[in-house]
Design a protein with these regions (language model features):
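Short alpha-helical donor nucleotide-sugar binding micro-motif in glycosyltransferases
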Residues: 359-360, 367-372
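Nucleotide-activated donor-binding/catalytic signature segment of Leloir-type glycosyltransferases, i.e.
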Residues: 342-360
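A conserved mid-protein helix/loop that constitutes part of the nucleotide-sugar donor-binding site
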Residues: 128-136, 295, 304-319, 336-342, ...
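Conserved donor-binding/catalytic core segment of Leloir-type glycosyltransferases
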Residues: 114-120, 289-308, 314-317, 330
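Short His-centered aromatic/hydrophobic patch
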Residues: 201-207
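Short hydrophobic beta-strand element within catalytic cores of glycosyltransferases
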Residues: 152, 397-400
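Conserved acidic donor-binding segment of nucleotide-sugar-dependent glycosyltransferases
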Residues: 412-413, 417-424, 433-438
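Aromatic "clamp/platform" in nucleotide-sugar-dependent glycosyltransferases that forms part
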Residues: 380
Length: 471
């Protein structure tokens, strides 16, 4: 079967190593970057997407997902290049096909051991909302004495809280996302050795591929629960490649739930959750209500362009400068864009207004937000930003982009402000408005706290998870 690969990046190179294990033959690589046209990978030429119009009966595998504003949406491939929906494949459609021929699934008898539940964190628990959520849910399971639940990750002694150390199994994947036969087989062997079991996944990785392949062979011995933390088209594509073996979905926002149902997932197996987090019973804090004082802006999270759009954050800062907004911007976090931000601050002599303060520990994040008037989020893809929820629980006014996750909690003009994705000009205008109308800080900040507080219910949350895991 003739196949085009759309996208010439890392995932394309990975697929080219596994195509020989599938019935597909790669006849070309497509990329939207003109600089790559005419070059080749493994002897296969890279061409313009226009080539798809001439070969619209061929299969097309979209190999990647990128930032949501640049991503090749399947609908666009249908409408613009006349590629039939049934001819569109994802990266994982190919990987599943290949590993059905590569993987070794040992034959075992019926296992009678206690059913155990494994939350996958095999890529490592660095900085990030998903990683924080995994540690938090383990804490709750310990607190509520929920047994037989374990976290799979690298037990390095630095990122694991003491209270959950005995709930962590030292299992990790080297170079997660590369899908080497050695690491995929390692995950397969783990699943088989621990049947019967439930695997709870928060991203598509080697453990998901392994659980899928084992469940195909032992459907009664393995249950798969997918927690969807993201809302971009590529993430939906990836997840739905495993649809036939996923027992339940848990979505971090109602918008994600609606989209999965729209894409063919049965409504009765799709659930939503609001993860609990600490907050004070009463909101006691101060705002920068005097016009002579600068507004205190805050950001907490990964310092990356991918999804978090730190490049847009810098453009926002320049617009604030242009509009002569009085502000101090405290940026908490770390990431690959950190050096670029530091250089930007130095080049524009902003060190008295823009401060990079590094990572803030989870138990100190409330104190961080209590000192900020406004919480900034410029992401182009958010499933449900934990940082934004934490900010609202501390009374910071959210000014955010219109992602599915942010709008789950932020209502424009009620408890914060929402602007279109990448629209840093409108965001700067909202901040300028707040500067000129300081009374809205207390009004919106208090409402943000009230609205977010109503959604937090640890007992209800644990009860929901117990039903999902044990019924």
């Amino acid at each position: 079967m003739q196949l085009y690969l759309y996208g010439s990046g890392k995932r394309c190179e990975i697929l080219l190593k596994f195509i020989k294990y599938t019935p597909y033959k790669v006849c070309g690589i497509i990329d939207s970057n003109p600089a790559k046209w005419g070059t080749e990978i493994d002897g296969i030429f890279i061409s313009s997407p226009q080539e798809l119009i001439e070969h619209n009966e061929a299969l097309v595998c979209v190999t990647f997902y990128s930032t949501i504003v640049h991503e090749p949406i399947w609908d666009v491939l249908e409408q613009k290049y006349r590629i039939k929906r049934y001819n569109l494949l994802s990266f994982y459609d190919i990987m599943i096909e290949a590993y059905r021929n590569i993987a070794r699934i040992d034959k075992v008898g019926l296992c009678n051991r206690n059913h155990r539940i494994f939350f996958d964190g095999s890529w490592g628990l660095g900085l990030g909302g998903v990683e924080s959520w995994l540690k938090d849910i383990m804490r709750l399971f310990v607190e509520y004495d929920i047994s037989n639940c374990f976290l799979l990750t690298h037990l390095d002694g630095t990122t694991i809280p003491d209270c959950i150390q005995n709930r962590v199994l030292d299992f990790s994947i080297a170079e997660s996302g590369v899908y080497t036969p050695k690491e995929v087989q390692k995950a397969i062997d783990f699943v088989i050795c621990n049947m019967p079991c439930t695997i709870v996944l928060s991203r598509i990785d080697e453990v998901m591929l392994a659980a899928f392949l084992v469940k195909e062979n032992y459907p009664e011995q393995v249950r798969i629960i997918m927690v969807d933390h993201g809302s971009c088209d590529g993430m939906y594509r990836d997840i739905l490649s495993f649809k036939s073996m996923i027992d339940k979905y848990v979505c971090v926002s109602s918008g994600i739930k609606k989209e999965l149902i729209k894409r063919g997932v049965a409504e009765e197996i799709v659930h939503t959750m609001t993860a609990p987090m600490p907050y004070e019973d009463n909101l006691i804090r101060k705002y920068s209500t005097e016009f002579s004082k600068p507004l205190k802006l805050g950001y907490a999270g990964r310092l990356e362009v991918f999804e978090k759009r730190m490049d847009i954050l810098l453009k926002l800062i320049m617009r604030l400068e242009y509009k002569h907004v009085k502000y101090v911007f405290n940026i908490a976090g770390s990431g690959s864009y950190e050096a670029m931000i530091q250089r930007f601050v130095y080049d524009n002599a902003l060190d008295n207004r823009v401060r990079l303060i590094g990572n803030v520990e989870r138990d100190k994040i409330s104190s961080f937000w209590e000192k900020q008037d406004i919480a900034i989020n410029v992401s182009d893809n958010e499933g449900r930003p934990i940082s934004n929820m934490e900010a609202m629980l501390s009374g910071a006014v959210p000014v955010v982009t219109m992602t599915v996750g942010a709008t789950e909690d932020v209502a424009d003009g009620r408890n914060g402000y929402v602007v279109p994705i990448c629209d840093y000009e409108s965001m700067a205008e909202k901040i300028k408005y707040i500067e000129l109308h300081r009374d809205v800080l207390c009004k919106l900040g208090t409402q943000a706290y009230i609205d977010m507080k109503k959604k937090i219910n640890p007992k209800q949350y644990v009860s929901m998870w117990c039903k999902l895991l044990y019924e």
